[in-house]
Each structure stands twice: as C-alpha cells, then as structure tokens.
C-alpha cells in the first residue's frame, strides 16, 4: 500500500510540475494587461477580449502559492505574486470592499456584484 501511495504521489507531482504548472506559466500569462488570460480556445489560442474571473484568479493564486510552499521554486512564487497583485489591483473593490466577480481584459470592473462564493476563494 505504501508503495502504491508513493508511486501515485510521484506521478501526480510529475504531472503538476511537468505539465500543469508549466502550461499556466507559458501560455496563460497576460503580458499586455497583467494577470492571466481569462480564456483560451480548445486549441490553446487566447480568446481576445475575454473577461477575467475572480474565482479563476484566486485558484491560480492558491495553486502557485501551494506549489511554492511545497517545492520551493522561485518561478512558482513569481506566479503566485502575479496572481495576488492582480487580485488586489483589479478585483478588489477599493471603495466598498469585497471582490468583483469579473473584470474586463484590461482589468477594469465588468461584473461588480459581490458573491460569497467569490469572496470565499479570495480569502
């Protein structure tokens, strides 16, 4: 049993560090407007003008923060910091508190409603 669990852990870590995290670092970083692209097509192309959602951004923050905490790679810290900055700069409502549900591609507020679901991820 211990061998099976160890093997599964190794496979999952390999998938995470060899595929999942590199995909986000290499294909989803929005170098024009900051943060990460809101959407890509089924063939991996950016969808211009796609909105960005707070839940996805918060999940990216959690994922890269956790990856850095466990694996201590500076590139993961850089991505976590990028996601945190996006959350604070564009999703956080500096006037009334809480987080916007979504922002436009350029980071301007789009759907300004406050949902407890989104707040849970942002916290």
Residue positions per predicted region:
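Glycan-recognition and catalytic cores of secretory/periplasmic carbohydrate-active enzymes
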Residues: 1-123
